A protein has these predicted regions:
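Short alpha-helix capping/helix-loop boundary micro-motifs
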Residues: 23-27
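Absolute protein N-terminus
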Residues: 1-2, 72
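A residue-level detector for short acidic-glycine micro-motifs
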Residues: 5, 16, 41-43
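C-terminal structural segments of small proteins and small subunits
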Residues: 43-72
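A structural micro-motif recognizing beta-strand termini
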Residues: 17-19, 30
Length: 72
């Protein structure tokens, strides 16, 4: 499953990032978004969602959220 299907307020663990874009992968890594890290969807709008990673909150678009694969 990916972040677009995650429930708000529930903590998940990042399984992998599905992207061929090295720049995007490096950007996510700089946020602390990589395999094994906990992540929580704080809120969701139509085109974006706010996630919590390592006590920081980030607003990401749905295309980026689809690339972040998670598990419970």
């Amino acid at each position: 499953m990916n972040l677009t299907t995650a429930k708000e307020g529930k903590e998940y663990v990042i399984q992998r990032i599905e992207t061929d874009d090295q720049e995007l992968d490096a950007f996510l890594f700089s946020l602390g978004c990589y395999s094994g890290e906990p992540i929580t969807v704080v809120s969701r709008k139509k085109k974006t969602c706010v996630v919590s990673i390592k006590d920081s909150r980030y607003s990401i678009d749905n295309q980026l959220a689809e690339a972040i694969m998670i598990y419970e």
